[in-house]
Amino acid sequence: MAKKSMIEREKKRSRLIAKYADKRAELKEQLRQAEDLDDKIEIQRQLQRLPRNSAPSRHRNRCWVTGRPRGYYRDFGLSRNVLREWAHQGLLPGVVKSSW
């Protein structure tokens, strides 16, 4: 189980990403369309003034049960350990053990 502080930090990042998504997209579009170098530099500065944790690249997928950041399955939102355990218990509809 991940530390609660790490899980909360990731939740805070998610909130910041959602809060600043429109502003960030707008600035990036302005940057793309700007032709003057001084304008581009100013827009880039505005982008850099946004909170660091509002960048989507800082988001880390975590298991919603354990908070584990590695071995994450996007389809389920679970780590490999929980996925295996729940699949064996039959808690995941449609998931069956492979056999050939």
From Swiss-Prot:
Keywords: Ribonucleoprotein, Ribosomal protein, RNA-binding, rRNA-binding. Signal peptide: none annotated. It comes from the Bacteria. Pfam families: Ribosomal_S14. Part of the 30S ribosomal subunit. Contacts proteins S3 and S10. NCBIfam families: PRK08881.1. PANTHER family: 30S RIBOSOMAL PROTEIN S14, SMALL RIBOSOMAL SUBUNIT PROTEIN US14M. Belongs to the universal ribosomal protein uS14 family. This is Small ribosomal subunit protein uS14. The gene is rpsN.
